[in-house]
């Protein structure tokens, strides 16, 4: 009992003396290292010797254990003993700067690479993003020699050494490619052409790409999916990646005295371990043998990461629709008077966008990311997030809490971040591993990184949309043709999509008016190519207008205006018609594969046939256009009839079926696509 101890302050005592379970308990400071600790009891003066090597400053990181009674025997495997009565001792292990001890190693985390999550975005720690930007820099330098020379002059003037000049020049050119327009500046661009007479068209939108739609007597529209946000995802599990240990306590028993126990074992905040250790005369036991020992330490998490589950109904898609008006800077503005921002959610999948001067476009979207959220978890660590495999996440060997836990202290699997050292007779060292943030970054190699904005997670994936264009109309169809002169403000520039962009300015009278624009062969007999900016118009005199068009491969003339004063610009387009044909066909087939069952209308017999027709147009339209360019539509129909007739009369079954199919496709495309070619 407490009355057994006469706590008279001795002359040399600079430590604090209290009791623990009725036994004396010393709380020792760093200054007592190597000194004899004296205090009086009923049995006389008790002298304790403390030789602990880890004795440091008093802090919350403490060690508590019992110094055994030794009168005549030599101490063995102990660093504290007393000569009158066994005594508890507590001391801190912090350094003078207050730092805690920790184990400088990481948990063996399985790398995420190869876990089977295939997405089209760049993966964590891949060089793809840097390589893409290097390509953009190269293209920008080649297309903007004037700016490049200016950047070189600035770098030469500002820098004092060759290294500084080179670095400044690289930085200036690296910033420049980010200042581009919307669809023209995006390398992954898809052109979707509507079937003549159709009121709707299917498109596939994905991040990092742009879709340009064209249809007869309808404005050309640019669509870009700029953002997919996951709103308020639910937390599945929290993992601790950095922890600290405090209040370490050890209790031990001599052989045959049973298992030791501590009150801390009942507290879920503590991590504990039972072991066996050699005991004998040298450490306070009358018998030699194995004695039990238990050590507990309070586990506190300093930094954690969370795994969140995203439900498809929590996704919100943001699309920007921009009509090709020809106005300066019209293409590429997210907001303002040119572009219209549309929000799509599973709850409101049908939305309308009012395009000033062009009517209304209705979008019926199927919000699908193309990702199976049952197999995925969003791993969020500070300001970064990754898309990881669910099973990989659940198997991480780290302390964790259920997502519903609000207390944040009852961590499960705490021992994964704790190392119990080999036990001594009366004491056992426990250390916590260092921060696992770096190990997690390494293990996440190959996982898809997810961007964050205002606490919401930005996703990847694609969006399938059906555009209804029956309420759209072309602006300026009733205008007369411009009869005055045009001036080239900016020379013809080739885009990375095989199209050209030219900026012209009208100097004549009679605006607003329609701009006469044609692309012709060298003999000026046939109209070739197609206009991407449908029905370009001048709204006011001396106002620059951007026109985008797709010239044919090889030499051609671009003719703007009427005689006299007609602009005639020669243009040569590099490349192969056959190569372009196959590339476009592959794009169409890929688009149909992504659309899947949403491309088909099984609501009516007419809907089925319309869907089949649109599928044929999307996949085979490019081959057909390349094979029969310049051929009249009546001749195309005749060729289709002849191929079908030959197939029906062929004796070979496989050849007959093949020719009949080719003939039917040719007939259909000949009837339906006659209004899509030319300008």
Swiss-Prot record:
Glycosylation-annotated residues: 83, 247, 333
SUPFAM superfamilies: E set domains, Viral glycoprotein, central and dimerisation domains
Disulfide bonds: 183-210, 240-301, 254-285, 272-296, 365-465, 482-513
Record field: transmembrane: 2-22, 139-159, 166-180, 626-646, 653-673
Annotated keywords: Clathrin-mediated endocytosis of virus by host, Cleavage on pair of basic residues, Disulfide bond, Fusion of virus membrane with host endosomal membrane, Fusion of virus membrane with host membrane, Glycoprotein, Host endoplasmic reticulum, Host membrane, Host-virus interaction, Inhibition of host innate immune response by virus, Membrane, Secreted, Suppressor of RNA silencing, Transmembrane, Transmembrane helix, Viral attachment to host cell, Viral envelope protein, Viral immunoevasion, Viral nucleoprotein, Viral penetration into host cytoplasm, Virion, Virus endocytosis by host, Virus entry into host cell, Zinc
Gene Ontology MF annotations: protein dimerization activity
InterPro entries (alphabetical): Env_glycoprot_M_flavivir, Env_glycoprot_M_sf_flavivir, Flav_gly_cen_dom_subdom1, Flavi_E_Ig-like, Flavi_E_Stem/Anchor_dom, Flavi_E_Stem/Anchor_dom_sf, Flavi_Glycoprot_E_cen/dimer, Flavi_propep
Residue ranges, Extracellular side: 23-138, 181-625, 674-679
Pfam families referenced in this protein's UniProt entry, alphabetically: Flavi_E_stem, Flavi_glycop_C, Flavi_glycoprot, Flavi_M, Flavi_propep
Gene3D superfamilies: 1.20.1280.260, 2.60.40.350, Flavivirus envelope glycoprotein M-like, Flavivirus polyprotein propeptide domain, Tick-borne Encephalitis virus Glycoprotein, domain 1, Viral Envelope Glycoprotein, domain 2, Viral Envelope Glycoprotein, domain 3
Residues annotated as site: Cleavage: 14-15, 105-106, 180-181, 675-676
GO BP terms: clathrin-dependent endocytosis of virus by host cell; fusion of virus membrane with host endosome membrane; symbiont-mediated suppression of host innate immune response; virion attachment to host cell
GO cellular component: extracellular region; host cell endoplasmic reticulum membrane; membrane; viral envelope; viral nucleocapsid; virion membrane
Positions of the pro-segment in this chain: 1-14
Region annotation Fusion peptide: where it falls in the sequence: 278-291
Positions on the Cytoplasmic side per record topology: 160-165, 647-652
Domain of life: Viruses
Entry note about domains: The transmembrane domains of the small envelope protein M and envelope protein E contain an endoplasmic reticulum retention signal.
Protein name (database record): Genome polyprotein
